[in-house]
Amino acid sequence: MKEIITAIHKNGKFQNNKIIRPHLTDRLGLRLIFPEGSKCILWTDGRKYYARCEAFGALFTVNIPQKIGDDLWEKFMQKYEGNYTYEDI
């Protein structure tokens, strides 16, 4: 799993400037895409992070360490510099 977490952290690119906000939950998510065509959504409740990924036709969930999750959110905030929107789903 460590290789998957490293790939998410190093190779993931933000698909757009939208923060996903599901109805009636306290979760927020970011869409990530990868060069080989895989996709993930990085979810957080403010304390814990996990990624729900689709790769090679399979869906799987990966727990993300807080330090890496915080770093990905910080990169998102720096990239879009407050120019992001919420997507209610």
Q: At which residue positions do the language-model features occur?
A:
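Function-determining sites in protein domains
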Residues: 1-89
